Amino acid sequence: MSIQGTILVVDDEVRSQEALRRVLREDFEVLCVGNATDAEKLLEGEIVHAILCDQRMPHESGVSFLKRVRELWPDPVRMIISGYSESEDIIAGLNEAGIYQYITKPWQPDQLVETVKEAVQLYRLQKETETAGVDVKATSGHIKKVVSVKRGVAKQLYDFDRIVHSTESPMHAVIELGRRAADYDISVLITGESGTGKELLARAIHYGSARANRAFVVENCGALPDELLESELFGCKKGAFTGAYQDRIGLFEVADGGTIFLDEIGETSPAFQVKLLRVLQESEIRPLGAQRVRKVDVRVVAATNRDLEAEVEAGRFRRDLYYRLAAFPVHMPALRERPMDIPLIAEGVLSAVKSSFNRPNLRFARSALEEFGKYHWPGNVRELQNEIQRMAVLADRDELAAPPLLGRRNGKRSAPLPAHGRLNGSASLKDKVEDLEKSVIMNCLERNDGNISRVASELGLSRVGLRNKLSRYDLRKNAKGDAFS
């Protein structure tokens, strides 16, 4: 095992510390503290390459702490990890504290490890360029070589042939569509439920295309308010809005010559959709606060778990933008629609778990694979990955038996939807639809014991979208977790 760097985790919850340590310890030395005071004491005597800090702590916010770290110990790369998405906190974090990455809960282990690896790499590149006496933005031959090698690895990692599926799987047709899309410089819209692998397909399309040697950039459009989303994508000038303390290059410029993946595009507002449409039509962006436009050459791959055609008919999504994005539509099947792939995917996940948990003898009992086949997997492949990791953590033996929690979920049937008088009465269509939507959400909350992540996944909503609906229907008291704390 090769340790790539030292990571400082600052989180007041011991369970969160342990979860991060477990995921990162394979590649990094992980130091955990529960508050800012202990973190500062540690920074005085340790060389730390990157800091992962929770936003909400008892006596001080993560942003406030990292702002001070930036002044006193500017070298470590700073990252915020949180389940909260207040716009002012995010804006302040990205600008005042010089945050490299804002990571939202629930985070995915593989993505988190890659993000931290990139942060450590950035630390080393900064130190190298300081030693050479040049600005970190200057592209040296060494940096070009690092980037070239990294993209070569990515091309192998995200090849279409590495997408797990059997010959009888509906994924076979999806992959063929993806290969065709890769051959042409055309916008692609990937639809499907949360956790089906939309980003994986988007990466395969990029790395199978003529743009493979340029950047592939990801933005989750459902996680940020309009102003910050525009700043992220189009860039901004210093002073363009509250918290814009420096010029910022947008992701469209970062992706120039490459591909940008716009996840959860269906969560965007009509006002933002107008601005995105212009970018697609004119191939140019205007950073917030700037007077001049800038030309960009970027391929757009968008994804959504919503029925965008229905959203268009309802007036919530612009028709002209939909047709721009859906020049080449591809639908990802749910995991329950490809049961023949479940054993293959499960074995692939288990192989990764063996390595990351250093338990090479782990194996599935036959009963576990049978249980996997019975379950409907509302969270799709992502839920299957999480379930296998959980099984490995809880297992005292090398054989992973049928998980009892999964068995209880299998036996848990949906209660009948409550009968509302307005559904059968003379109420307006809007009122009837709202009543039905509230009933569905209540039913799902009950079935999942109020777990926000599972409910959002099952309903095909982002956590932000679900929180809004819980507030609208006064269902916040039915939810558990950190959604409203």
Swiss-Prot record:
Q: What is its main location?
A: cytoplasm
Spans annotated as Disordered: 404-426
Looking at the record, the residues that make up the Sigma-54 factor interaction domain are: 166-392
Answer whether the UniProt record assigns the keyword DNA-binding to this protein.
yes
Record-annotated Response regulatory domain positions: 6-120
Quick one: a GO biological-process term for this protein? phosphorelay signal transduction system
GO MF, one term, reads: ATP binding
The UniProt entry's GO CC annotations, sorted and at most eight, read: cytoplasm; protein-DNA complex
Assigned keywords, A-Z? Activator, ATP-binding, Cytoplasm, DNA-binding, Nucleotide-binding, Phosphoprotein, Transcription, Transcription regulation, Two-component regulatory system
Q: Which residues bind ATP?
A: 192-199, 264-273
Q: What does this protein do?
A: Probable member of the two-component regulatory system involved in the regulation of the hydrogenase activity. HoxA is probably phosphorylated by a sensory component (which could be HoxX) and then acts in conjunction with sigma-54 as a transcriptional activator.
Put simply, this protein is called: Hydrogenase transcriptional regulatory protein HoxA
Organism (species): Bradyrhizobium diazoefficiens (strain JCM 10833 / BCRC 13528 / IAM 13628 / NBRC 14792 / USDA 110)
Organism lineage: Bacteria, Pseudomonadati, Pseudomonadota, Alphaproteobacteria, Hyphomicrobiales
